[in-house]
Amino acid sequence: MPLDFLITKCGIGLHLLPILVCILSLVAVTTCYFLSLTQDHISPYFPYISDAGSKIPESCIFGQLLNIISVLAGLCFYSWHKHLLDPSHKFNQRCYRQIKLARIALCFGFICAFGMSVVANFQETAVWSMHLFGAGLLFGGGSIYALIVTYITYKYIVRSRIWIARLVLAFISLFSFILQPTTGLIARFMYDGDNIRKWKPTDKAGIIHEFTIIHRHANS
């Protein structure tokens, strides 16, 4: 009840939540990247985001910020859900299909937020399998959430062209999510260097590695 009241009645400033998520995400990535470089933990040549937050001390910052971001992201998903079901915004609550779609979208949004928390707390150097599991929840849940939200926007929110931008972003996210595991595994098995977190342009499968990272960043 207190959370519903906060979302539906005290909505001042809730529109800033997505902006705050983006700002904190940028801070987390850039801070960990430069800190990892100073500690000589990664290669400066376009590393994975997870590589930049896999060792102490940057892993502490990475984990803390991502945990905060995951909570804020969950609030974003929930606030959009409540906003959508508000009768004052012309959403037909008597239509079972719209309500069901909104709830399904919320579930995948929470899966995405939970996956981010798993990624934050299980670094790849600690428990690699759990880190991959969390990444799957994060990017997979986020991609499906984006597709459902795009459909809802197109089908039920009239006089809005924002669905076009959402459709483009949703397909970029889905396409990147599908390609990442394939190209990432190929690059990993073909790698012939000494430290997999310090890829160099001359390493074998370097182009595939960079291609994978581009899709990972696009998905993020």
Go through the PLM ranges and name each one.
Residues 126-138, 161-163:
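Non-cytosolic membrane-interface motifs at loop->transmembrane helix junctions
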Residues 154-161:
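Alpha-helical transmembrane segments
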